Amino acid sequence: MTKKEMLYEGKGKKLFKTDDENLLISEFKDDLTAFNAEKRGNESGKGALNCKISTEIFHLLEKNGIKTHLVEIISDTEQVVKKCKIVPIEVIVRNVATGSLTKRLGIKDGTVLPFALVEFCLKDDALGDPFINDEHCLILNLVQNEAQISEIKNMARKINSILTPFFDNKNLRLIDFKIELGLTKDNELVLADEISPDSCRFWDKFSNEKLDKDRFRQDLGNVKMAYEEVLKRILN
């Protein structure tokens, strides 16, 4: 497969065309961003860690019936993925209240929610990725119909039901996570983007030590060490 010109560069990855019109190469970057890219940094080796972590998680999800855009991993930082049209919604699943949820609703940080909360954000950096509801999704034509909203929510909850016990077995609490979904050329909804410490909050099961991008957001240090610890636990 030939890697061709860059199609898109985001905060954490670059996408490249290939000699197959239905496949792209996704390259994970070492860049770190927070607060809608107002805070920026770089951690050597982070891209490779996220590539490996996300690949392992996507393989786990595929074995459990979740369809993804992943085809194969071809280097330390590169995956071959199916070309798909990204649904312009960030889907957030929360098991424990922290971050923006506590600020918006006044829920005490660390409160275990009675059930997984699914939230939507509009993918628009200029607007600050605002929170939106089902009706917004329909009015803005972000989804095809109400049935697709239900499909998105059901997929998000199924992913959570697979990952929560998996990580619990690795002595990690899956506090919350963000996913992006895409539509293939056959109009099939698939999990796209990544699932990694960049897009999840992981707390140690016993100490509640943060092992994710919050270490960068909150200037806690040892970002790479935390990502390495997550990968080690996934593989063990």
From Swiss-Prot:
Pfam families: SAICAR_synt (PF01259)
Pathway the protein acts in: Purine metabolism; IMP biosynthesis via de novo pathway; 5-amino-1-(5-phospho-D-ribosyl)imidazole-4-carboxamide from 5-amino-1-(5-phospho-D-ribosyl)imidazole-4-carboxylate: step 1/2
Source taxon at top rank: Bacteria
PROSITE patterns: SAICAR_SYNTHETASE_1
InterPro entries: SAICAR_synt/ADE2_N, SAICAR_synt_PurC, SAICAR_synth, SAICAR_synthetase, SAICAR_synthetase_CS
Cystine pairs: none
BP term (GO), one: cobalamin biosynthetic process
Assigned protein family: Belongs to the SAICAR synthetase family.
Protein name: Phosphoribosylaminoimidazole-succinocarboxamide synthase
Organism: Campylobacter jejuni subsp. jejuni serotype O:2 (strain ATCC 700819 / NCTC 11168)
